[in-house]
């Protein structure tokens, strides 16, 4: 065993820094912050995205677009999800009961993704052309 081969015990944790506990600790007086300047002050430091006074990137670039509020309450339903609904009738309430869509959803559209094997009746939902053809080919029907 030599001094250069010593290491802490497995799973041990290094003690945290104790600031301002005298000059001999190495972290007294200025507490590791150096002398003066913005970063030495309480609450000192610059905000995220600050570029030293230069016009920051997020302000140099133009604004564009918006976030649709309707998108948060709209869902897409795959054809393969229709089989998870019990009873053969698919509408917003049965989709919510089967945990396919969230309770906040107000609009839904069935899309051609996956496949439908059992005949189902889709009621009160929008349906794409491809999904409509697949549902009718499986013996199901769409009611507006």
Swiss-Prot record:
Residues 1-54 are annotated as: Disordered. InterPro entries: Ribosomal_uL15, Ribosomal_uL15/eL18, Ribosomal_uL15/eL18_sf, Ribosomal_uL15_bac-type, Ribosomal_uL15_CS. GO terms for cellular component: cytoplasm; cytosolic large ribosomal subunit. It comes from the Bacteria. SUPFAM superfamilies: Ribosomal proteins L15p and L18e (SSF52080). Residues 21-31 have a biased composition (Gly residues). Belongs to the universal ribosomal protein uL15 family. This protein binds the 5S rRNA. It is required for the late stages of subunit assembly, and is essential for 5S rRNA assembly onto the ribosome. This is Large ribosomal subunit protein uL15.
